[in-house]
């Protein structure tokens, strides 16, 4: 993961003032798994593009942006760009995404291991976590979950990632999103002391370190 890189444009198109850009390599993280995409800038000579979203279409990462200086032509788009991610925004996304992992672990501790993630939304400002349970949570249960999550945040748990075979990852106890299709190798995000992690999930998103 990096927040700045020199990049080349593979292809682009413009529609009503909005550029859709495919880069040869990209520091921008695309929206996926409920996590919103990165924003930032692309600068080459006198051309400046404000990237307001990054999405993934058929496994291709696409930056969507608008020209803020200069003009996008085949010539100006053919140069080398400096791609810069809005890193402060990304830090907030990291925090909220890691919080959803802590939240799921806390929910399973308080409500039971039947709790399964059904969806999520992670942005710099808010997070939403959808999960299955038999009934509405009581005020006492909500408070217990909140206390656990806050305690884990204050404990500054170590966070590490591993690339593992998907079957080995699931066998190790890593949580997977029900119905999600995974490749042969997956990224596992672990929070807590090695061997006794509080949270262990299959996840390709951004997290605190």
Regions from the PLM with identified roles:
Residues 1-209:
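A glycine- and charged-residue-rich anion-binding loop/surface
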């Amino acid at each position: 993961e990096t927040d700045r890189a020199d990049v080349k444009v593979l292809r682009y198109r413009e529609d009503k003032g909005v550029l859709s850009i495919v880069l040869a390599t990209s520091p921008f993280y695309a929206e996926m798994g409920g996590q919103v995409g990165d924003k930032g800038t692309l600068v080459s000579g006198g051309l400046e593009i404000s990237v307001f979203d990054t999405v993934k279409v058929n496994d291709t990462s696409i930056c969507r942006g608008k020209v803020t200086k200069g003009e996008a032509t085949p010539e100006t788009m053919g140069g080398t760009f400096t791609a810069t991610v809005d890193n402060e925004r990304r830090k907030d996304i990291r925090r909220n995404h890691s919080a959803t992992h802590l939240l799921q672990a806390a929910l399973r501790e308080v409500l039971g291991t039947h709790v399964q993630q059904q969806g999520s939304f992670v942005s710099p400002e808010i997070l939403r976590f959808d999960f299955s349970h038999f009934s509405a949570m009581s005020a006492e249960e909500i408070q217990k979950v909140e206390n656990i999550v806050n305690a884990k945040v204050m404990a500054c748990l170590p966070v590490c990632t591993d690339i593992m075979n998907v079957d080995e990852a699931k066998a190790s106890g890593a949580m997977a999103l029900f119905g999600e299709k995974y490749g042969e190798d997956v990224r596992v995000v672990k929070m807590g002391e090695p061997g006794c992690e509080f949270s262990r999930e299959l996840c390709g998103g951004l997290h605190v370190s």
